[in-house]
Amino acid sequence: MPLELIAPRPRTAEFRTYADDELQPDQVRIRSLYGAPKHGTELNMYRGTNPFQEKQYDSEWQVFRQTEQRPTPFPMGLGNMFVGEVTELGSQVTNIRISDMVAGYGNLRETHTLPASDLLVTPDSMA
């Protein structure tokens, strides 16, 4: 089973196994090679200090106002972007090939299954 990096609770990271989603006709499966977290917003969520958790932004007054507490985001996947190699194609995918290098948005995990339209094929010069 592949692994992903999650935060089960604030300030705690661990690996968890997951099952790949079934590949749909418009989707691509990718083996992740590189990934990155989003240091600003994600770090606040990881720490459990995200102001959007208990407050709502008032755009008129440009301040956060107290609201009812929203559901906790934990467990949450960590990371938000990746680069990887295409390993499988759905039957309707025509613009991507097996072994293409692609970039996309997703958590830090070993594989991703996403619509082809959500991916950017990287130029050969980036290999």
Name each region found by the language model.
Residues 9-10, 87-92, 116-117:
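Short loop segments at secondary-structure junctions
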Residues 15, 119-121:
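Predominantly a core beta-strand signature of beta-propeller blades
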Residues 105-118:
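A structural motif shared across PLP-dependent enzymes of the aminotransferase-like
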Residues 105, 123-127:
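A glycine-rich, Thr/Ser-enriched phosphate-binding loop motif common to dinucleotide/cofactor-binding enzymes
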Residues 7-9, 98-101, 118:
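Soluble, non-transmembrane catalytic domains of enzymes that act on hydrophobic metabolites at membranes
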Residues 1-75:
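Short N-terminal strand-loop motif that marks the start
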Residues 72-105:
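A glycine-/small-residue-rich N-terminal strand-loop-strand element
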